[in-house]
A protein has these predicted regions:
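A charged N-terminal "starter" segment
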Residues: 1-21
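Activity-critical C-terminal alpha-helical subdomain
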Residues: 270-304
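Glycine-rich N-terminal segment of FAD-binding domains in flavoprotein oxidoreductases
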Residues: 18-109, 120
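FAD-binding subdomain of flavoenzyme oxidoreductases
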Residues: 108, 113, 120-255
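General beta-strand structural signal in soluble alpha/beta enzymes
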Residues: 2-9, 35-39, 46-49, 67-73, ...
């Protein structure tokens, strides 16, 4: 749908009649960008935006019309099926803002190479052209050792949930009240801690390498305090949308990322029960607005 087609709505009798047409109309009205219809029968559309702050409203529109919100830098579009899709491209590389010495806040489009040049040494082994969303969602960029998700330097995330509600995820303790007013988060936190107590997670905590799974080790007070946002490191785009990242610069050689210290063929005796992860997905993203793990395009494959 082109911009000039949009202005015909309501003037020449061209009005949206179906849920899909109404969805496209709302997206067009929000972005004033050309919508590329990839497949009208399967209801797959693509939009390119310049303002990353439109993500929350786009997610809200997707939730209203039960359309998947998929970020083009994370998804293998050929593996997606079974539901209407909005493929989102963001033509913007933002720059970090420093809130104090060695601590910055950066949008998901900020390039990892820019952060590395500014002294954030945890990005040493991340390809410089990748952005924070790609880094956050790719398991192989994060520390291979249990309890060491702290070496990401990630402190907090301004998070958007599949119902378009927001929360700042970070440290979590007895007096935390971040779940108040957010139904999905309110249901998800007990489920996260429930999974953290399973046999599989208990075994992984004493293993030499954490698998390519959610970082439930971040829910244990060991070398660092409990941190909710670090649970989702390497989440493959499946559970939350990370909009803005609060990151602390780390000295060199603090991180042992999986893409450097482990091989792809290394087998894990224990992995998190997939049924537990499926139940978590149904709680935190019941409509499937975000992608599923098997729809994620591994960064190593994208760069071949």
């Amino acid at each position: 749908m082109r911009r000039r087609d949009f202005f015909k709505f309501g003037k020449k009798g061209i009005v949206p009649k179906t849920n899909w047409e109404m969805f496209l109309h709302r997206v067009q009205r929000l972005t004033f960008s050309d919508i590329k219809l990839i497949d009208t029968e399967l209801q797959i559309a693509c939009i390119e935006i310049k303002n990353p702050n439109l993500a929350q409203t786009l997610i809200s529109i997707c939730a209203d019309h039960q359309v998947a919100f998929l970020y083009d830098k994370l998804v293998d579009i050929d593996s997606v099926s079974g539901r209407p899709i909005l493929l989102v491209k963001v033509n913007n590389n933002s720059t970090p803002d420093f809130v104090s010495e060695g601590v910055c806040v950066a949008d998901f489009t900020c390039l990892c190479g820019d952060l590395f040049e500014k002294g954030f040494n945890q990005f040493e082994f991340v390809p410089p052209e990748l952005n924070l969303s790609q880094w956050f969602n790719e398991p192989s960029f994060h520390d291979s050792r249990p309890y060491y998700s702290i070496t990401s330097g990630l402190m907090e995330i301004d998070t958007i949930f599949s119902n378009a509600m927001t929360a700042r995820l970070g440290g979590f303790g007895l007096n935390s009240n971040i779940a108040l007013g957010n139904a999905l988060l309110n249901k998800s936190i007990p489920e996260l801690f429930k999974i953290s107590q399973t046999f599989e997670v208990t075994e992984l905590l004493v293993s030499p390498v954490w698998p390519d799974e959610l970082r439930f080790d971040s829910l244990f007070k060991n070398i660092s305090d409990i941190n909710l946002c670090r649970v989702f490191l390497g989440q493959r785009g499946s559970y939350i949308w990370g909009q803005r990242f609060y990151i602390k610069a780390l000295p060199p050689k603090k991180i042992s990322p999986k893409n450097i210290v482990t091989s792809e063929d290394e087998e894990q005796e224990f992995k998190i029960n997939p049924i537990d992860l499926m139940e978590l997905k149904e709680i935190i993203d019941p409509q499937g607005i975000f992608q599923y793990e098997d729809e994620f395009c591994e960064i190593r494959n994208r760069m071949l």
